[in-house]
């Protein structure tokens, strides 16, 4: 199975991302429900501009993070580590992403928080269900996939 396809299928079944940003040597992490766009290889999240992580991100920033399940046994561990870029969406781009997000999470219709995109540039997917320590790597810029 193609690496990005396997990663995308797994990410589509999850819903919480943890991401971290840094500003002037200070690190901060946050969690949010996400919508995964397999075509753009990006997460869409909602977060208020007044939050510490949004203020540290500004309009655009480097980001790293994880998505993982909570299995009770090592043999079932699956998870993603990533790096990329976070940016606040504006205009039509924001509206399209919000509509898709609201379809996935209808309760979000009541929120006015801005929509942000986390573009994934590097993904490492660990899937112990395929064998202990099995890792798949995807890189945006090189088109490289490693199993």
UniProtKB/Swiss-Prot annotation:
Signal peptide: none annotated. InterPro entries: Split_barrel_FMN-bd, UPF0306. NCBIfam families: PRK03467.1 (NF002900). Belongs to the UPF0306 family. This is UPF0306 protein YhbP. It comes from Escherichia coli (strain SMS-3-5 / SECEC). The gene is yhbP.
